[in-house]
Amino acid sequence: MSKEKTYLKWYNKVGYGSGDVAGNVVYALLTSFIMIYLTDTIGLNAGVIGVLIAVSKIFDGITDIIFGTLIDKTHTKMGKAKPWMLYGFIGCAITLIGVFAIPMNMDNFAQYAWFFICYTLLNSVFYTANNIAYSALTALVTKNSKERVQMGSYRFIFAFGTSLLIQAVTFQFVEAMGGGANGWRTVAIIYAVIGLIVNTISALSVKELSDEELADSETKTEETKYSFGEAFKILVHNKYYVMITVTYILQQFYGAMIGVGTYYAKYVLADENMFGTFAWFINIPLIIALIFTPTIVQKWNGIYKLNKYSYMVATVGRLLVAVAGYMGNIPLMLAFTALAALGQGPWQGDMNAVIASCSEYSWLTKHKHVDGIMYSCTSLGVKIGGGLGTAIVGLLLDFSGFKGILTVQPDSAINMLHIMYLIVPFALDLIIAFILSKMNVEKANAEIKEKLGISENEVVMESQN
């Protein structure tokens, strides 16, 4: 078997990966701090916030497919995805500031409306366009499977590094900026500007391959012919796309539950800065795992086994976190949190490569190139999983009797925090581990190639674009 052609230098991979600094400026700030900002600073009801977020998610499922289709049909000098990545984040920056700049002199109804409009525009329109385009670049700037894994690893190293910093310093940063509503607004402005700069650098650091390099003329003709309905059918008939989407949704739902750590640290551990400590024990092991993921994938000659066994480790780790949490043993909680994060890391690094293989599966079975819409699962997962998770957090907090104006919360609220922060993440990891044990798309592709009598390199060169 001939060696795969390489397309990227190290600085292209690093530049691309830095784009998740911008994505996590939005995502980490929203999932970790939006609820506690709205309840404890603005004074809004957690249950109402949860309902508004849930309603906002109705728009998300529609816009994900729409933007994925639009990217597939875009043809500009910059390429298919880069224009959406660049211009989409301008809207992200503006609406992110809007979410954290709710006027205190408005009545509650107007504040809820302000939040809903800004939050929906941020998630359903601008973040969708930016994130799907950013993810799709993995398939548009290289056809080399190993480079795709490396791009994913660089990407998520930046993602978790950014998430770590935001989770670790935001509470103190808000206080340094004056605290209260003004402090949150100032921090959001600073984060948005940083994200805008880094997103631009990332988009300009890679070059999309030409149509001629990506596919032959026959494939291009097919690509421009499929309709929205056909694209949807291609996706739902690809069982691996469904698996990846469900996994991504559960994973982001998991992130929303871990975001309850802001409340858990403040009201259970009686020290809100402990949230930052837990962030270190989550993100450092994730980054370590990401660094070694490409090497392990190459050594094991595949992704499936690594994802399967590493998530088993993650599941055991979260079970032990729950046990330590109910024991009240913080050092053990931190240690097992690190173990769980170490197990979750490989999937974060090789996920984009799995999606690329999933796209190849669609080409092998349906003979259609749907890379842009295939990567809609990442944005769909972030918004439905993270957004719906945040919504459920709000509803459960309200149901438990939580009141942001109270210094000491009732026992029912404390018990609910234990369930959301300790039990639910373990259950989610268990489900994800089961799905990953069934997600052997590499084997499925190899069997189809053998049946069709198509060489491995020929398929990689012509279909994974």
What are these language model-derived features?
Residues 2-464:
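Membrane-embedded alpha-helical bundles of multi-pass transporters/translocases
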